[in-house]
Amino acid sequence: MRSVKVLATLLAVLTICGVPAGASASHLSYAPERPQSGWTVGATTARGVVTDYKMERVAGVWFRVFRLRARTALLRWHVGATDPPGAWHTVPSDAGPAVNWPNEGLAGVVGVFNGGFKVGAKAGGSMVDGLTLSPMVPGDMTIAIDAAGHWRMGVWGQSLPSRSFHPIALRQNLGPLVLGGRLTSAAYANIFSWGSPLNNQPSEPRSGLGVDAAGNLIYVATMSDIGPVTLGQALLAAGVRTGMELDMNPYWPILGGSFHPLHAPGPLPVQIPYSEHDPAIYFNGWQRDFFVGLAEPNSWTCSWVSPGLTTRGLVPQPLRAVGTGCPRS
């Protein structure tokens, strides 16, 4: 069974890289992930760029933009210590309220950033490692992550769930903000439907997440006071084709990006200007859910994978390297 999974993973890697599945891996060459004009390179590996970042000015507001490259990065989702309520004591350590250094550190952490609203806000459902923490809501925008750390974003009940994508984690947060490269009509509707602001003031610091035409994952955030329309415009300016709002209000938007894969706690210099928190809080445990970006192995013929949801119920999802040219554990 393991040999079948290894072969399937290698074929998937070859397909993603645009290589004929019948070609010999020893005779293949892979184009590195290259820098792009207008972006500053963050973390790199032998594969090329893993993350990059920039500041984007939209409607007079500066946004931090952080991008995970689809060919060189993978994604994980973690619960918080207090939200979702009780999840910390139920989920395995690979999805707990702190970066799981013994396992995720093998790959190398390249970025961390906040999740969505708390469960009490009734902004959507979530699932991790086979454990449903809140029921999925039809019509809500969903970020899905599979056993290889690949991501897909779509509206639940439309493009997700999908027979071709098998998630180990799901996170919803309200309806779609960007679809087909355009703001949705809901973005212009009642501003209070996009989150409960402090002191009834609808313009607040906000964060968002989206996927561009190349499949890259893009996080945007500002500590300036904005509404959902401006957040959506920032996602569009960053190249997002499908996007959603994440958490809001001054206390919750948090981002940290490294300049190289971290195998132990280290510097995260790429941050949201004027954020209220050092992103290193995710290293030791944080109260709310968050995402972790990791680096793929240096070899194009090796990938980090977890077991997947092969049975019903809770299934821990530790990473292991599969393929050829993999790092020694």
Where are these regions (language model features)?
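Positively charged n-region of N-terminal signal peptides that target proteins for export
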Residues: 1-6
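Bacterial N-terminal signal peptides
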Residues: 8-18
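C-terminal region of N-terminal signal peptides and the immediate post-cleavage residues
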Residues: 17-27
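Zymogen propeptides
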Residues: 25-135, 304-329
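Conserved hydrophobic/aromatic beta-strand scaffold that supports enzyme active sites
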Residues: 63-67, 142, 176, 208, ...
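Aspartyl protease catalytic domain
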Residues: 77-238, 309
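Extended C-terminal subregions enriched in glycine
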Residues: 178-180, 194-306
